Amino acid sequence: FIMMLGLAGVALDLMRYEERRTVLQNTADRAVLAAADLNQTIPCKDVVKDYFVKGGLPAPSDSQINCQNGAFDEWREVTVAVSEDLPTWFMNMYGIPKLATPAAATAEERIGQVEISLVLDVSGSMDSNSRLINLKPAAKKFIDDMFDSVEEGKLSISIVPFNTQVSIGPDLIDYFNLDADHDFSYCLEFDPNDFKTTSLTTNIDPVTGNVDLAARKYKQNGHFDAFAGSSTYTPSPDFGLNCTQDRGRDILAFSGNRDQLKAYIDSFDAYGYTSIDLGMKWGAALLDPAMAPIVDDMIAAGTLKDSSGKVLSEFGDRPYQFSNQEALKVVVLMSDGANTTEYELQPDVDSGLSPLWRSNSTTYNGSTSAAQYSLWDQSRGQYYIFYNNTWRNEAWGDGTYKTCGTCAFKPDPGDAVQLSWQEVWDRMTVNWYARYIHGRAYGLATTNAWSSSWSPSNSVVKHETNKDAQTLDICTTFKSANNTLYGRRPQIYTIAFEAPNAGINVLRSCASSTTQFYNASGSTIGGTFTAIASSINKLRLTY
């Protein structure tokens, strides 16, 4: 009987032990969860101690509590390890006067994923008043601030430089079906309705990963120089072309490499007009989950790497769904101007074969003379030969011509080759063609004559009046992209950098709130980008 009583007493001590250990463990669990909350304003160790005291337990010592924070409070980890001696009632008779009741708990809270599109104006006016000079260090510090405040692998930044157009480069353009593609430059044209959606339709089937040729076709912007005067034959490879050929101006998409991003910003120069709507469209599109197949393909190809050269396979889910509760999507849009002019070729001179033929004779290698060309006129059924200013039945290079004093007929040099419209615009500026090809063939000697005859119906279309509306359409669409009860609202920060009133009004209306619009000048642009980085980090902490 005494032995049975002793065993019952031991069982009672063990029950008391387990009850006390459970109380300790539950209190420790609740304490670290509360202390690790990133919204918690009370000092971490004070929170833990308070939970124990209110639970009727001794407060842990400072040495029993470990609190760690990220440099920008982007993460917090709290650990507590305690032990309490429980006096025994019956086990003492067997030489066990007390039982240690340990409890340990760890809790961690970390900020989720961040996706940023940095949309920067690099139009010609950015060369004025040292704006581009001031922008570069400011934007690079923003890059550093963001990478310093976000865990490795959780931040991606796309940079979208814009002027008259936005060049997306040969790699990115391959993910879109085009109605008339060429390899001279890489810009897309959009319809007004495209600014009422954040997405673009890629040619990658989201299920199979194969190329989908039935997907929507986009119109590729023509390769042409509409800026140069009629005396300029060769298009400027950078400053004259509507869509630049400078590969250093292509969109840098989905980068997790701060060194790559900063070097890219350093390479900028300024030229061209201003198309805020196109910049914002691409900034929003690069944050839309429709781009996810492109990111997956870039990871598979090994082209998405961090500064150490490691492939960023963790980017595989980007861009995240707008409803994702852990992802924050941000556009930072900077311009020093207002929407001005965008050019598009008229359909008749945008693609397909032109009426212009050229002799491929080596005589004309490097030549800028009209003598190498002939122009077909469908209504006459003849070619105008610029070599001798006559009409005849064969293109220059396919017939013969008469020379005097011998008055003999000689074969034309070379063979005639019909040029596509894109080949024409790669060779000559729009105004040179209008004056020295169209104007000369039809006897239009004055500037007014050849310009009014050819330009209105055939050359370029300007888009000025609707660009502000398109900008506000895409801004509104992006800000309201997540209309669910879940996830985070996409955010837009805008900077008017010494901009005129028209630009200020558009940028202010585009921003997510009045406090997310900044009016900057001179070197204060640096403080503006610092403030935006700080605001983004606060947004990450308050969701």
Which positions does each model-derived feature cover?
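Low-complexity, S/T/G/P-rich flexible repeat/linker segments used as non-globular hinges
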Residues: 88-129, 137-144, 525-543
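Von Willebrand factor A/integrin I-like adhesion domains
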Residues: 52-60, 471-543
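Structural recognition of the beta-strand scaffold that forms the well-ordered cores
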Residues: 25-26, 115-120, 157-161, 330-333, ...
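Alpha-helical assembly-interface signal, strongest on the long, hydrophobic N-terminal helix that forms
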Residues: 1-46, 124, 511
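MIDAS-like acidic motif and immediate structural context at the N-terminus
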Residues: 6-9, 13, 110-135, 332-340
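Extended low-complexity, polyampholyte segments enriched in Ser/Thr/Pro and acidic residues
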Residues: 41-108
